[in-house]
Regions:
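Conserved phosphate-binding catalytic cores of ATP/NTP-utilizing and phosphoryl-transfer enzymes
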Residues: 95-125, 245-255
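Active-site rim beta-loop-alpha module in soluble metabolic enzymes
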Residues: 139, 144, 151-210
Length: 259
C-alpha cells in the first residue's frame, strides 16, 4: 500500500492506496507546533481506524505548502511505517512542462493537481482548487502548465467579512433558499457562495476567450463541493484529485509495481 499525504495551510489530507483503489481518506488540522510524535500518533490512529498495519505500507509521498510542517510529518510517517516518504519538490519527475516565469515558485499542490488532471481528463484544462486560497490553474492543449490565478479562499473571505464588520456574524456555509437575501445571515451566505460561483464562471469565460477554445474544468478542495453546484459552467468535481496525483508521482519516481 502507498501512503499519500497532502499538507495544506488549514488541513492535512491523508490517503492510502492499494493499487489504484483509495482505501483510506482522512482529514486533520495542520498544526505548525505539533511534534513528529504527535503527528505519528494521528497517523497511527487513522490507519488503525481502517485496520491497516504499518507493515502494509511499502512507501509514501508527501506534498506540502507549509515548509515548517513538511519534515515533521515526513519523520512521523517514516518513523511509524518504516517506509521511505518521497517529498514533492525540485528534481522530482512530473511529466508536466512548466511554461511559467519561475517553475521553482510553483506550489507543489498545483503541480500534483496538474499531474492528476492531465492523466484523467481532456486538455486544455482548468483546475480549480478551493482551499485556504482558491487557485485556478490552466493547462494548454500541449499539456503544459501555463499559469494560474490566485484569490482568497471562500472561508478566508467569510472570516474577513465577519471579523472586520462589527455587525456581521460568523455563519455556516449552507446554500440559502433564494439568491436575494431577506436577512443578514442569508444575505451573507448568498454573497459568499454565489459571489464565488460567479467569480469562477467569469474566470472560466475569460480563460476560454484568451486560449481561443473551451477547456475541461475540474474542481477540487474542501469547499469545491459547495461552490461548483452553483456555477453555470459544467465543472467536474474530483475531491480526491491531489491524492490521485500523488499516487501517479509515486509510481513515476519509485517504480510502477502496484501493491
Amino acid at each position: 500500500m502507498i501512503l499519500t499525504i497532502d499538507i495544506g495551510n488549514t488541513n492535512i489530507v491523508m490517503g492510502c492506496f492499494h493499487k489504484d483503489q483509495l482505501l483510506l481518506l482522512e482529514r486533520f488540522s495542520t498544526e505548525q507546533d505539533s511534534t513528529s510524535l504527535e503527528y505519528a500518533t494521528i497517523i497511527r490512529e487513522m490507519l488503525d481506524l481502517h485496520e491497516i498495519t504499518p507493515a502494509q505500507i511499502r512507501g509514501g509521498i508527501i506534498s506540502s505548502v507549509v515548509p515548517s510542517v513538511t519534515n515533521t510529518v515526513r519523520e512521523a510517517a517514516e518513523k511509524f511505517t518504516g517506509a521511505r516518504m518521497l517529498v514533492v519538490g525540485p528534481g522530482i519527475k512530473t511529466g508536466i512542462k512548466l511554461a511559467v516565469d519561475d517553475p521553482a515558485q510553483q506550489g507543489s499542490d498545483l503541480i500534483v493537481g496538474a499531474v492528476a488532471g492531465v492523466h484523467s481528463y481532456p486538455v486544455p484544462q482548468i483546475i480549480i482548487d478551493m482551499g485556504t486560497a482558491t487557485t485556478v490553474s490552466v493547462i494548454n492543449r500541449d499539456k503544459a502548465y501555463i499559469g494560474k490565478m490566485i484569490l482568497p479562499g471562500v472561508a478566508v473571505s467569510l472570516n474577513a467579512l465577519s471579523g472586520k464588520a462589527a455587525q456581521l456574524p460568523y455563519i455556516s456555509l449552507e446554500k440559502p433558499k433564494k439568491l436575494i437575501g431577506s436577512n443578514t445571515v442569508d444575505s451573507m451566505k448568498s454573497g459568499i457562495l454565489y459571489g464565488n460561483a460567479g467569480a469562477m464562471d467569469g474566470l472560466i469565460d475569460r480563460i476560454n476567450e484568451e486560449l481561443g477554445e473551451e477547456c475541461t474544468v475540474v474542481a477540487t478542495g474542501g469547499l469545491a463541493g459547495v461552490i461548483t453546484p452553483l456555477c453555470r459552467h459544467e465543472i467536474i468535481l474530483d475531491e480526491d484529485l491531489l491524492l490521485k496525483g500523488l499516487l501517479i508521482l509515486y509510481y513515476k519516481n519509485c517504480g510502477n509495481e502496484k501493491e
